[in-house]
């Protein structure tokens, strides 16, 4: 079987409010103001596809939020999204590979984050057979082509794949292609799934 796992809030806990809190502190802008003005719009998606530079992304977001931050300050906030690894999921990934299954990560991410998490959380790459990252592929979830690409590269049919993601839209997109989609709603979703199918951790 091919097991495809999203990264944020599946393998590692993330919280975007932490990003805005850092930017609020550094810019002197109230958190409530930033929360209202920030949106994951077109530039956000372009950044995840690797279609714009980190500097262009930072400048655009700062303009949209009407805040003045240096690139270093922007980056400090951007990296604050990460909380910690979910060790129970890392353990499952390792056990799946030991049992002969293929385990890959499929994440909507960006160059700024990729400059950070691989060094701070090396167990993610160490526990996966391959990392499929949106900015390397010029595609992002929930676009069907990104799922088709992973299946083709891995040599599995949709009915041989299980996909875990915390965003329902992504799960539905994978399911529409015939992949078994699991919506991760909390830390227990992944361990509970494998208990239900009889896979021992």
Language-model features, listed with the residues they occupy:
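Hydrophobic alpha-helical core bundles mediating ligand binding, dimerization, or RNAP-core interactions
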Residues: 19-23, 58-61, 78, 113-117
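Short beta-strand segments
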Residues: 8, 13, 104-108, 165
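Generic hydrophobic alpha-helical segments
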Residues: 34, 43-47, 93
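Short, acidic loop-to-helix structural element flanking the phosphoryl-transfer center
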Residues: 72-104, 144
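Active-site neighborhood of HAD-like aspartate-dependent phosphohydrolases
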Residues: 1-39, 67, 176-177, 192
